[in-house]
């Protein structure tokens, strides 16, 4: 039996329907395009272009690692994005053509990380700032797609520069700022040199987080970690004023934008969005948002603007009434699980750190958010009758919520010693089976008002990673990171069969006819096992590079899907054991994957907080 992956030529590509995700940790990562119709933001290694009104998405893919900064030219013709990479390796800057959504050039000089990027006002030059291991500033010619010159970004006795901004009127002047350094640079094109002038702040010592410049270049403003704003004159290189004197912005001024009509939009690390004016910087208008503000981008002249926060929220704010509207949101941490309710593909639930969210499948809208502060949810399942969402938490509790309102229905305290790591429900809605970090599998009897422990099954030596229940509720299979899969008899509550392999099992599935199971894990192999006697039927090479973390099988049992640390979604033919389709789009490790009831979609979730929806390639 041939267990090799068939040649790539025969493998079709999976069609990506939609992406739910936004990396809010990238400073000034959210941008509004000058056409005022699209917003551009990073997610993992991808740059997303999304229509604000129609929500239509395009993807710019080309980075080999996470995108760390983003810039857009004033004309809107070009997008530049920089990435992080491993120590000592070159980090790429990619120049994109916005109109055709294609890669124009790859600019490689910096090492380790690209800290910040800025375009000159007439699209002549791009300036880039290297990360802490690189420490240089480079000016690139956009026409020639080549470096003009470079220089160390900061002096010897100060910290790193982390922010860069171009002058609004002149193509030859830009400013950099960072830890104890503020510099104004002049580009000398005939001699291919850049000349810095250190700005004088007197006794003030500040670490700059954000930078903004007036439309006429008369002043530039620096937001600091101290929570105040420095106003500098680029001609005299002197400090004009500093404020506010009292009530500084909590957790620093993390985003700053100058408005054409005068005044500043300021975002703080504590999520406060403020409109204020120099020299007092007292709040004239303010609103509190969720998560530290990392981006403020104007839509047009600033009558409306978009705000991005660390908790991956994108808000639209109109200047006149200063009220926020949440237009996009997603998980800001690794997504641990995804599940569809029985028999419907209209909605699905995901869980991550702090919360469980229920999404509308076709529109990508968040319908419900259930928050439990400072806890992580490792697994979720819908009861078959749709009356509750059962969830497994790292504080050792099993919590049940109402799916329409998010109301807490009941809690099973101390369900497991080292956190609950996996959970499943029976189709008669009378039992919940949970697995813990210590390796115990526990069967709970769920009544109208009571939750009773029926049995604790102690066989596994390490955490339980996945539980699947047979359709008749008389048997279930649990996979564990101790290298065993155990098939349990749920009537007599004892072990039926044990499967051993030299791997950390991450996922397991029953074939719909329920005489075989398929497993996978860190050894990258997909194994088919006989349920009756636990013998291995066949093994396939599931991935060439990383662990397989998620797996699901269709209701007919003809195809199954896998996803893992190689960031690829693969569709397999069950009988042939061959890959038929591959989906490329994830930037983080895929943690779980599901096929929707009715085989319309495949939904995969990953460690970078992204949820990707793929079109199922076969018609059922």
UniProtKB/Swiss-Prot annotation:
Expression by tissue, per the entry, reads: Expressed in respiratory cells and sperm (at protein level). Highly expressed in testis. Up-regulated in hepatocellular carcinoma (HCC).
Q: What GO biological process, any one, is recorded here?
A: flagellated sperm motility
* Keywords in alphabetical order: Cell projection, Cilium, Cytoplasm, Cytoskeleton, Disease variant, Flagellum, Heterotaxy, Repeat, WD repeat
Q: Where does the protein principally reside?
A: cytoplasm
- Which positions does the entry assign to WD repeats? 62-106, 109-150, 156-195, 288-327, 330-369, 372-411, 415-454, 459-498, 500-539, 543-582, 585-620
Instruction: Quote the annotated effect of residue 271 to R.
Output: In HTX10; loss of panaxonemal expression in respiratory cilia
Q: Does the keyword Isomerase apply?
A: no
Q: Which PANTHER family match?
A: CILIA- AND FLAGELLA-ASSOCIATED PROTEIN 52, WD-40 REPEAT PROTEIN
**Cited function:** Microtubule inner protein (MIP) part of the dynein-decorated doublet microtubules (DMTs) in cilia axoneme. Important for proper ciliary and flagellar beating. May act in cooperation with CFAP45 and axonemal dynein subunit DNAH11. May play a role in cell growth and/or survival.
Q: Which family does it belong to?
A: Belongs to the CFAP52 family.
Q: How does it assemble?
A: Microtubule inner protein component of sperm flagellar doublet microtubules. Interacts with BRCA2. Interacts with the CCT chaperonin complex. Interacts with HSP70. Interacts with AK8. Interacts with CFAP45. Interacts with DNAI1. Interacts with IQDC.
- For this entry, the protein name equals Cilia- and flagella-associated protein 52
């Amino acid at each position: 039996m041939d267990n090799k992956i068939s040649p790539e030529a025969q493998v079709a590509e999976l069609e990506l329907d939609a992406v739910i995700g936004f990396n809010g940790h990238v400073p000034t990562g959210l941008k509004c395009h000058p056409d005022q119709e699209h917003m551009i933001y990073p997610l993992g290694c991808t740059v997303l272009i999304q229509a604000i009104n129609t929500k239509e998405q395009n993807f710019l893919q080309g980075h080999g690692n996470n995108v760390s900064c983003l810039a857009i030219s004033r004309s809107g013709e070009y997008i530049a994005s920089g990435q992080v990479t491993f120590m000592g390796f070159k980090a790429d800057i990619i120049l994109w053509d916005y109109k055709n959504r294609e890669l124009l050039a790859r600019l490689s000089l910096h090492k380790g990380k690209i800290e910040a990027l800025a375009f000159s006002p007439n699209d002549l030059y791009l300036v880039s700032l290297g990360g802490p291991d690189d420490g240089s500033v480079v000016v690139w010619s956009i026409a020639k797609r080549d470096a003009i010159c470079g220089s160390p970004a900061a002096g010897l006795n100060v910290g790193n520069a982390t922010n860069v901004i171009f002058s609004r009127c002149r193509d030859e002047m830009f400013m950099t700022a960072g830890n104890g350094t503020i510099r104004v640079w002049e580009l000398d094109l005939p001699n291919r040199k850049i000349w810095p002038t250190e700005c004088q702040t007197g006794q003030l010592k500040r670490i700059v987080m954000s930078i903004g410049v007036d439309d006429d270049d008369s002043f530039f403003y620096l937001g600091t970690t101290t929570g105040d704003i420095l106003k500098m004159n680029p001609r005299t290189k002197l400090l004009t004023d500093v404020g506010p004197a009292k009530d500084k912005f909590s957790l620093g001024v993390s985003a700053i934008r100058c408005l054409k009509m005068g005044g500043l939009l300021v975002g703080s690390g504590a999520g406060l969005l403020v409109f204020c004016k120099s020299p007092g910087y007292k709040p004239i208008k303010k609103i509190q948002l969720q998560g530290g503000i990392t981006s403020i981008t104007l839509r047009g002249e600033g009558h409306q603007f978009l705000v991005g926060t660390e908790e991956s929220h994108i808000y639209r704010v109109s200047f006149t009434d200063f009220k926020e509207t949440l237009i996009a949101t997603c998980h800001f941490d690794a997504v641990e699980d995804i599940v569809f309710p029985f028999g419907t593909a209209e909605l699905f639930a995901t869980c991550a750190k702090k919360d469980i969210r229920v999404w509308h499948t076709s529109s990508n809208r968040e319908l419900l958010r259930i928050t439990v502060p400072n806890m992580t949810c490792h697994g979720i399942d819908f009861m078959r009758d749709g009356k509750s969402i059962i969830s497994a938490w790292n504080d050792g509790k099993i919590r049940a919520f109402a799916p329409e309102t998010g109301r807490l229905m009941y809690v099973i305290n101390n369900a497991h010693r080292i956190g609950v790591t996996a959970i499943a429900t029976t189709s008669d809605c009378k039992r919940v089976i949970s697995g813990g970090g210590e390796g115990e599998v526990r069967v709970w009897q769920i009544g109208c008002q009571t939750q009773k422990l029926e049995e604790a099954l102690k066989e596994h030596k390490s955490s339980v990673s996945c539980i699947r229940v047979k359709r008749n509720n008389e048997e279930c299979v649990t996979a564990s990171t101790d290298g065993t899969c155990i098939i349990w008899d749920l009537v007599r509550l004892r072990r039926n069969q044990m499967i051993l392999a030299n791997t950390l099992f991450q996922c397991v599935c029953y074939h719909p006819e329920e005489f075989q199971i398929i497993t996978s894990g860190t050894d990258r192999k997909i194994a088919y096992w006989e349920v009756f006697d636990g013998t291995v039927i066949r093994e396939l090479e599931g991935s060439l590079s990383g662990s397989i973390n998620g797996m699901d099988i269709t209701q007919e049992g003809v195809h199954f899907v896998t996803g893992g640390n190689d960031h690829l979604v693969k569709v397999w033919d069950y009988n042939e054991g061959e890959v038929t389709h591959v989906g490329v789009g994830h930037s983080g490790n895929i943690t779980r994957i599901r096929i929707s009831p009715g085989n319309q979609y495949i939904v995969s979730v990953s460690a970078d907080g992204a949820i990707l929806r793929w079109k199922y390639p076969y018609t059922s």
